[in-house]
A protein has these predicted regions:
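Surface-exposed binding/hinge segments that line
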Residues: 3-4, 302
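Twin-arginine (Tat) signal peptide motif
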Residues: 4-20
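N-terminal compositionally biased, intrinsically disordered segments and leader/signal-like regions
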Residues: 4-5, 28, 62
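N-terminal secretory/targeting leader peptides
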Residues: 18, 38-125, 133-134, 142-341
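Bacterial N-terminal signal peptides
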Residues: 18-31
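Sec/Tat signal peptide C-region and signal peptidase I cleavage site
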Residues: 32-38
Length: 341
């Protein structure tokens, strides 16, 4: 009788070999390149038109993505209304907005103090006070509104632009001038005796083209990107209102990041001082091109500018007082910082 050999392995051995094979397969699979962890999408918004200011805001957007060390995919998008953009961030529909202090005043009215006409005796004074104190002043105010202040970007100084030259306050008096909804705009033009016509930004450009208004005020690097550069080709360098912007994040979205990611983002952002320097350096060649294209830049002297200052500055305390106690405190803190320089 022939003896047959069983080809079946003992059950225990089969189980051991099966487990070993499964382990090897898992190890091999882990070593294979697979899909990267999904990045969270963050949208960064501002109202910047094509030009230097938009370039800055796109750089901020890219820096946020880079600083987060691969955790975020960032994209810049345009929203024409700063108030709308800010509300989108407050509600968490967008993650970051780059908004002027005037725009920020829609959620924290006292921040409009920074746009007070002729708040600073000189650009150098404003730079020093803002660089030393603004983060500490503005950060806690916005934190209470569900926003995290990450830093600042620059827009520049408002100047007067007009269809006909407006080189002195006397030439402004009685003229139909576009006044923005911001109290600072109403205060400035009211102090000069202008016939103010309130228009939102989007309606200002057709208003100038159609003669509804004869002048307005805007930062030069923004102005030249708009239709106003053609319809109101006279610019007087009054330098009356310094405009800068907060980079603000939705607080809940920010708190989802690790401390290392938050720190990386803050360090990756371009400094306000560097962006401010770029804006000011860009003005000279941009003005030269503007003049070559037929525009007129009226470079008034310090003595001529003082005529504007003397009509506006005395009304500052009463203007700020109308904003309420929080604004008065911020204004007083600014004055104390100016004196301490």
């Amino acid at each position: 009788m022939m003896t047959t050999l069983s080809l079946q392995r003992p059950r225990a051995r089969r189980g051991f070999l099966g487990a070993l094979a499964a382990l090897a397969l898992a190890t091999f699979a882990a070593a294979l390149p697979g899909p990267a962890a999904a990045k969270e999408e963050w949208r960064v918004t501002s109202a910047a038109q094509p030009g230097l200011l938009k370039d800055h805001h796109v750089r901020v957007t890219e820096a946020i993505g880079k600083g987060a060390a691969g955790a975020l995919k960032t994209e810049w998008q345009f929203i024409a209304s700063e108030q709308e953009a800010l509300q989108q961030v407050v509600r968490g529909r967008l993650q970051v907005a780059i908004v002027s202090t005037l725009g920020l005043s829609s959620v924290a009215p006292e921040l409009a103090v920074f746009a007070t006409p002729y708040l600073w005796a000189s650009p150098a004074e404003g730079d020093a006070v803002i660089d030393r104190h603004a983060m500490n002043w503005v950060g806690p105010i916005l934190d209470a509104k569900g926003l995290v202040l990450l830093g600042f970007t620059e827009t520049g100084f408002n100047d007067v632009m007009s269809k006909a030259p407006l080189r002195t306050p006397a030439e402004v008096k009685g003229r139909k001038i576009r006044v923005s909804p911001a109290p600072s705009s109403q205060f400035f033009w009211g102090s000069l005796g202008a016939n103010g016509v309130q228009l939102p930004l989007g309606e200002m450009f057709p208003g100038l083209e159609q003669g509804l208004v004869e002048g307005a005020d805007l930062p030069f690097v923004y102005y030249i990107t708009t239709p106003a550069a053609k319809s109101a080709p006279n610019v007087t360098l009054t330098r009356h209102t310094h405009l800068f912007n907060g980079i603000v994040a939705n607080k809940a979205a920010w708190q989802k990041l690790t401390a290392a990611q938050q720190d990386g983002i803050r360090k990756a952002l371009p400094s306000h001082a560097s962006l401010r320097g770029e804006v000011r350096a860009a003005e000279t060649p941009l003005m030269a091109k503007f003049e070559a294209d037929g525009g007129k830049v009226h470079r008034i002297t310090d003595a001529q500018r003082k005529a504007w200052y003397d009509l506006v500055a005395p009304g500052q305390p009463a203007y700020v007082e109308k904003m309420g106690p929080a604004a008065v405190k911020l204004f007083n803190d600014i004055q104390a910082a100016r004196r301490a320089r």
